[in-house]
Amino acid sequence: MDSNTVSSFQDILMRMSKMQLGSSSEDLNGMIIRLESLKLYRDSLGEAVMRMGDLHSLQSRNEKWREQLSQKFEEIRWLIEEVRHRLKNTENSFEQITFMQALQLLLEVEQEIRTFSFQLI
């Protein structure tokens, strides 16, 4: 994973954790946790691709990896919709910038996961 992506994740997660969105702070914490989870999942797929011999161990260790992949894409779609919704409803420029960067990062992560998964299939 390239260092810009790592710093982007860390920067966005840090800024999102500082936001005070009133009653929706639990939802925001959920988004942060899901983003962190997606980052870890994307990293593990990338590592598996780099060690192509791990494909068989990945499949034998977790025969439901395609199902997991499908769930991750659903999670990404949910997060994208949630970020878009928050982006539409906020007038705070700090939040707008943060959510726009989060949206861009989600789209990049989705593309990377697709690329990795096609290489593993």
UniProtKB/Swiss-Prot annotation:
Domain of life: Viruses
Record key words, sorted: Host nucleus, Host-virus interaction, Transport, Virion
Compartments it resides in: Virion; Host nucleus
Gene3D superfamilies reported in the protein's UniProt record: 1.10.287.230
Family recorded in the similarity comment: Belongs to the influenza viruses NEP family.
Motif window: Nuclear export signal: 12-21, 85-94
GO BP term, pick one: exit of virus from host cell nucleus through nuclear pore
Function statement: Mediates the nuclear export of encapsidated genomic RNAs (ribonucleoproteins, RNPs). Acts as an adapter between viral RNPs complexes and the nuclear export machinery of the cell. Possesses no intrinsic RNA-binding activity, but includes a C-terminal M1-binding domain. This domain is believed to allow recognition of RNPs bound to the protein M1.
Pfam family, one: Flu_NS2
Primary subcellular site in the record, as a coarse category: virion
InterPro entries: Flu_NS2 (IPR000968)
Gene Ontology cellular component terms for the protein in this record: host cell nucleus; virion component
Description of how the protein assembles with itself and partners: Interacts with protein M1. May interact with host nucleoporin RAB/HRB and exportin XPO1/CRM1.
Protein name: Nuclear export protein
